[in-house]
């Protein structure tokens, strides 16, 4: 009975707790004030944790949504939420998601698959022929304003509600929908072509009868596929064989994870040993693989061959996989397909990023809702003044239709076209070459930023690693003393070579050392340097690649002498970490060169040209959790087995033997801005290694909890290791980082640096880059692990004023768990914040916290795959295409090539985009309000009749050819030159207050519209003769001229295209007068009376506004006008 009692019984009524893990932040926790962190359960099921995390994300919204009820909520989007919820329930009811399971795949026998797997077809299309029109219409009419215009247009089919010609209302709506449909159709055709091109690619499929050609879309689970060099891998596969003698190949993964370095993949040993390809069908073998998952960096599976006695079992890991969307870089590979279609890693990781909506769009939406309310109120007032006579509800709806132009239907089209123009200008700017706009809907966000969250490595720094320091505990070597290390290496290997050439003669060695005491010291230093350099040259995942080998030339790796191929000048090093490449290049510079590497051995070339061979027994790759990597090698000459390991100081401190210098020297190097690695070794006997190998192989064959079991076995070996050295690698700053950060700081942008590096290194880079000024105090947040410590440290931080904050990821996690609001409030008051040891999840969490607790816009910038979540979470994401690949660049809204380009991107293009869109939006709304004011005046004078003032082509032409081009030309306007905007970044600070588009400016434009509309209408009524048609001709012509003059008075910097737009619009109107005899009296509009009446009305409507603008600019000029003058 005792076996059935759980060790940690948990009552069902216990309070909700969160999974506590240093690698991922606990986001939400409900507990009492007196709770103790030590009383929390250490583990929680993955499902429970995900539920707990999602509860945190949805709980605040749930509380808010409870208050969002009623008519206002429904009109502002509640109807859309309700419809979407109903559709989602219907979809889930009709089509349940298939449960993913582990599977057994037989080599070359897809018919043996127990289940039906997805078709291997790439489908990025949103619609098909049947669903295109309904789908696009739904996407448009799910917005309230578009639905409103549709209802207004449909109302014209009702005779009692009809105001004028049908095309008066249907033509603008049709134009907007046509533009949208054409744009969607073009994008859909492009997606269809790309999908068809990818799905039609031919691959060689291995069958019993030989090779056959098969399309990518026809590949099935269990097929044996042959992939040539430089060919894309069509589906997720297990690597079985290769044409390379080494049994391995390189793949390029830049389209999968964004990393440009080649990755080494290893074929299954059992199938690699088969004599010919056809033998794959003569064996009975299968692979058992885990269910499809998102993680592209891990894999668990087993290979089994049954036709042997005993059966052969091999464990499979990430090194045996070939994921789809990667490219074979060397040789020809054969693999068995295990996942296809939507179950492939690349497809599962392709998620739709959130549709980012700019702050300006949200502000315009609020203004249009205010206009809608004003339209309804105005219609009610007109009906009330009419006395609610007759069918007043019908008249109410007719007035709503008459005043529908208050809400401009062309607003969205104009803004979208303007955004496209801004994107084109950004990409054509020669001062920021290589800049790409990937999200064209938010260029105005670049002009409203308050917080900039930046990565360090590769963003502020060049990601160009240079070896700078080697510390042995008692002696340190820098760049100016590397020749001493080189001389020690030459001496050490010269002695070894001399001893080997003289055989077992013992007399030759003392003859070289006539002074016993001194040589003992030199020998001690030389041997320590020798061991350290050898460990650095062996402990890595770097592979030397020669141009001749990549191109297919077969070199003999078994050569034991200095080979011509080994001295090839075209040798390059491939590795997933630039730090490792820097270390290997340094060992080459001091005399110990890595010349060859395959699956089983490493070869080093000594300064004398001798080739030393080391057999690779085991490799333990670097992971973000372990923060270290190791290798076990056997030296060919002596047979000695040595376990080498290197890693971060926090991971290695508890592994190496006791010492009194490691922690201090790590801090010293970090203060110099160096990235540190601790190197250690451990000698193993044959018995020790055999015992370890047996336990390790048994753990690797486990399907369940394999990683935990393997880690436990490896940790049993990581004890009392001998500390060899500490290395320091420098990552130099990007060009013009200091002036760029100074520019951003003067623009009122607060800069937060989020990095995974250690605290000392991050602080040093913050100082050297002038992120933190040298005379500014820095508060280093002490490590905290519980609520009490966090409370005390926050109180200490609260007493500091105007100081930069430096905090680690672990302490940040504790603060956010207990004092989220208080911490964010204090941190936002700091001029700069540095968060070190941050995980990618924490970076994104910090972005979301700033969005939730402040009303300001955030921008995230980075260059690596670990920055993608932060970039996608920010209001504006900027990616740098750098050494770590293109993943951040591809996921970002804007892509740049250097950090310094962000200055011009924000100060010039961001500022101009915001001010231009603000002016464009208000002008389009002004164009609708002025004609609605004229309609209101006209109806009020003629006994509140719901009769249109203008009909037919006049209304259509007014919103299109007569005024569209001059108004849209505002996207070319600029208040100051780009040089002045960069010289005076304080101009950018004014934009964050949103004064260019606010309720104040909106009310000013409303008053202008009422004044001008009243003047135009009353003037035309006062000056007209006996014919009503004269009122229409005078008022409409004056309206067109007023709009053109208002645009001209608003422009601050003229462009030749603006002049052309004005002339074209005026010419179009004058030319159309000959065809408007249905609306105008042609004999009247050619008289002088018509001309002077139009001129007087136009002058009265515009001149007072110009005088007021001139006086305001003279006595209270804006900041930009002071610079432009």
Curated annotation (Swiss-Prot):
ATP binds at residues 455-457, 580, 622, 627, 646, 675-676, 755-757, 837, 843, 866-867. Mg(2+) binds at residues 455, 457, 863, 867. GO terms for molecular function: ATP binding; ATP hydrolysis activity; ATPase-coupled intramembrane lipid transporter activity; magnesium ion binding. It is a multi-pass membrane protein. Residues 558-567 have a biased composition (Acidic residues). It catalyses: ATP + H2O + phospholipidSide 1 = ADP + phosphate + phospholipidSide 2. It holds the Pfam family PhoLip_ATPase_N. Belongs to the cation transport ATPase (P-type) (TC 3.A.3) family. Type IV subfamily. Keywords: ATP-binding, Golgi apparatus, Lipid transport, Magnesium, Membrane, Metal-binding, Nucleotide-binding, Phosphoprotein, Translocase, Transmembrane, Transmembrane helix, Transport. The chain crosses the membrane at residues 132-152, 162-182, 370-390, 396-415, 929-949, 952-972, 1002-1022, 1031-1051, 1056-1076, 1089-1109. It is found in: Golgi apparatus, trans-Golgi network membrane. Residues 153-161, 391-395, 950-951, 1023-1030, 1077-1088 are extracellular. The active site is at 455 (4-aspartylphosphate intermediate). Residues 500-525, 552-574 are annotated as: Disordered. GO terms for cellular component: endosome; plasma membrane; trans-Golgi network. Residues 1-131, 183-369, 416-928, 973-1001, 1052-1055, 1110-1125 are cytoplasmic. Its main location: Golgi. It comes from Danio rerio (Zebrafish). Its cofactor is Mg(2+). The gene is atp9b. This is Probable phospholipid-transporting ATPase IIB. Its EC number is 7.6.2.1. GO terms for biological process: endocytosis; phospholipid translocation; retrograde vesicle-mediated transport, Golgi to endoplasmic reticulum. PANTHER family: PHOSPHOLIPID-TRANSPORTING ATPASE IIB-RELATED (PTHR24092:SF50), PROBABLE PHOSPHOLIPID-TRANSPORTING ATPASE (PTHR24092). NCBIfam families: ATPase-Plipid, ATPase_P-type. Residues 500-511 have a biased composition (Low complexity).
């Amino acid at each position: 009975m005792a076996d059935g009692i759980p060790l940690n019984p948990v009552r069902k009524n216990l309070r909700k707790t969160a999974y506590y893990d240093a690698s991922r932040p606990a986001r939400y926790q409900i507990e009492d004030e007196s709770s103790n962190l030590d009383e929390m359960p250490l583990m929680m099921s993955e499902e429970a944790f995900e539920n707990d995390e999602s509860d945190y994300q949805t709980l605040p919204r749930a509380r808010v949504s409870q208050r969002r009820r009623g008519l206002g909520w429904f009109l502002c989007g509640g109807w859309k939420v309700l419809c979407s919820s109903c559709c989602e329930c219907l979809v889930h009811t009709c089509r349940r998601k298939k449960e993913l399971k582990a599977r057994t795949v037989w080599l070359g026998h897809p018919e043996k698959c127990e289940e039906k797997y997805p078709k291997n077809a790439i489908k990025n299309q949103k619609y098909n022929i049947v669903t295109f029109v309904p789908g696009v219409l739904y996407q448009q009419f799910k917005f309230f304003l578009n639905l409103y215009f549709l209802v207004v247009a449909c109302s014209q089919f009702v005779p009692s509600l009809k105001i004028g010609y049908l095309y008066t209302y249907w033509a603008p709506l049709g134009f907007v929908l046509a533009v949208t449909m054409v744009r969607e159709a073009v994008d859909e055709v492009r997606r269809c072509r790309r999908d068809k091109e990818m799905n039609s690619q031919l691959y060689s499929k291995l069958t019993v009868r030989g090779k056959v050609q098969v399309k990518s879309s026809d590949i099935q689970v269990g097929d044996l596929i042959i992939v040539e060099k430089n060919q894309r891998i069509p589906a997720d596969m297990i690597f079985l064989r290769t044409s390379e003698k080494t049994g391995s190949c390189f793949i390029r993964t830049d389209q999968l994870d964004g990393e440009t370095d080649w990755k080494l993949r290893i074929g299954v040993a059992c199938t690699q040993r088969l004599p010919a390809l056809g033998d794959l069908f003569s064996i009975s073998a299968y692979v058992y693989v885990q269910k499809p998952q998102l993680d592209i960096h891990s894999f668990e599976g087993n290979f089994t061959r049954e036709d042997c006695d005993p059966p052969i079992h091999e464990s499979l890991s990430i090194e045996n996989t070939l994921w789809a969307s990667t490219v074979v870089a060397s040789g020809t590979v054969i693999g068995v397909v295990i996942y296809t279609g939507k179950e492939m890693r690349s497809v599962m990781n392709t998620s739709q990023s959130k549709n980012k909506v700019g702050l300006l769009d949200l502000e315009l939406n609020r203004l249009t809702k205010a206009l809608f309310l004003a339209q309804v109120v105005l219609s009610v007032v007109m009906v009330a003044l009419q006395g609610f006579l007759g069918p007043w509800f019908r008249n109410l709806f007719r007035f709503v239709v008459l005043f529908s132009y208050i809400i401009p239907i062309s607003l969205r089209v104009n803004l979208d076209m303007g955004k496209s123009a801004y994107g084109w200008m950004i990409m054509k700017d020669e001062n920021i070459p290589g800049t790409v706009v990937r999200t064209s809907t938010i260029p105005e966000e670049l002009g409203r930023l308050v917080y900039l969250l930046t990565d360090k490595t590769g963003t502020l720094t060049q990601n160009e690693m240079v070896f700078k320091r080697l510390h042995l505990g008692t002696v340190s070597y820098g760049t100016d003393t590397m020749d001493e290390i080189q001389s020690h290496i030459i001496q050490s290997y010269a002695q070894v070579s001399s001893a080997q050439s003289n055989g077992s003669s013992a007399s030759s060695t003392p003859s070289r050392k006539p002074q016993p005491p001194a040589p003992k010291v030199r020998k001690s230093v030389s041997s320590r340097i020798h061991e350290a350099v050898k460990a650095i040259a062996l402990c890595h995942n770097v592979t030397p690649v020669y141009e001749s080998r990549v191109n297919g030339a077969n070199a003999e790796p078994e050569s034991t002498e200095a080979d011509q191929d080994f001295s090839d000048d075209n040798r390059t090093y491939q590795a997933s970490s630039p730090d490792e490449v820097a270390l290997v290049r340094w060992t080459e510079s001091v005399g110990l060169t890595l010349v060859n590497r395959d699956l089983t051995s490493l070869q080093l070339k000594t300064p004398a040209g001798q080739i030393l061979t080391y057999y690779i027994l085991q490799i333990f790759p670097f992971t973000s959790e372990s923060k270290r990597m190791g290798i076990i090698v056997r030296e060919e000459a002596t047979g000695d087995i040595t376990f080498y390991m290197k890693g971060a100081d926090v991971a290695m401190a508890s592994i190496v033997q006791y010492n009194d210098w490691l922690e201090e020297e790590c801090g010293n190097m970090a203060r110099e801005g160096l990235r540190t690695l601790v190197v250690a070794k451990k000698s193993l006997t044959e018995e020790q290694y055999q015992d370890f190998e047996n336990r390790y192989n048994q753990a690797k064959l486990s399907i369940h909890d394999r990683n935990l079991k393997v880690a436990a076995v490896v940790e049993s070996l990581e004890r009392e290791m001998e500390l060899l050295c500490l290395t320091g690698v420098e990552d130099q700053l990007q060009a013009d980082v200091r002036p760029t950060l100074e520019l951003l700081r003067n623009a009122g942008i607060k800069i937060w640096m989020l990095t995974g590096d250690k605290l000392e290194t991050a602080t040093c880079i913050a100082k050297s880059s002038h992120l933190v000024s040298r005379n500014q105090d820095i508060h280093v947040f002490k490590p905290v692990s519980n609520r009490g410590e966090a409370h005390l440290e926050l109180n200490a931080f609260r007493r500091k004023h105007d100081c930069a904050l430096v905090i680690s990821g672990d302490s940040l996690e504790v603060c956010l768990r207990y004092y989220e609001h208080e911490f964010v409030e204090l941190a936002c008051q700091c001029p700069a914040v540095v968060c070190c040891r941050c995980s990618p999840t924490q970076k994104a969490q910090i972005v979301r916290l700033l969005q939730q607790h402040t009303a300001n816009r955030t921008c995230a910038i980075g260059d690596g795959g670990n920055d993608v979540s932060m970039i996608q979470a920010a209001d504006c994401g900027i990616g740098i295409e750098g050494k770590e690949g293109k993943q951040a660049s591809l996921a970002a809204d804007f892509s740049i090539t250097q950090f310094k380009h962000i200055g011009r991107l924000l100060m010039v293009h961001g500022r101009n985009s915001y001010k231009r869109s603000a002016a464009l939006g208000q002008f389009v709304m002004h164009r609708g309000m002025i004609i609605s004011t004229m309609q209101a005046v006209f109806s009020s004078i003629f006994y509140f009749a719901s009769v249109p003032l203008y009909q037919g082509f006049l209304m259509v032409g007014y919103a299109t050819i007569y005024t569209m081009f001059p108004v849209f030309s505002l996207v070319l306007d600029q208040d100051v030159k780009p040089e002045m905007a960069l010289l005076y970044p304080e101009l950018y600070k004014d934009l964050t207050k949103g004064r260019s588009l606010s309720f104040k400016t909106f009310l000013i434009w409303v008053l202008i519209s009422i004044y001008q509309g009243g003047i135009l209408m009353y003037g035309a009524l006062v000056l007209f003769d006996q014919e009503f048609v004269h009122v229409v001709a005078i008022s409409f012509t004056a309206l067109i001229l007023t709009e053109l003059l208002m645009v001209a008075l608003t422009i601050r910097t003229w462009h030749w295209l603006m002049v052309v737009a004005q002339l074209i619009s005026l010419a179009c109107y004058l030319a159309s007068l000959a065809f408007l005899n249905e609306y105008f009296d042609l004999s009247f509009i050619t008289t002088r009376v018509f001309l002077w009446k139009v001129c007087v009305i136009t002058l009265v409507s515009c001149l007072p506004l110009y005088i007021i603008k001139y006086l305001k600019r003279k006595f209270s000029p804006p900041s930009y006008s002071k610079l432009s003058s």
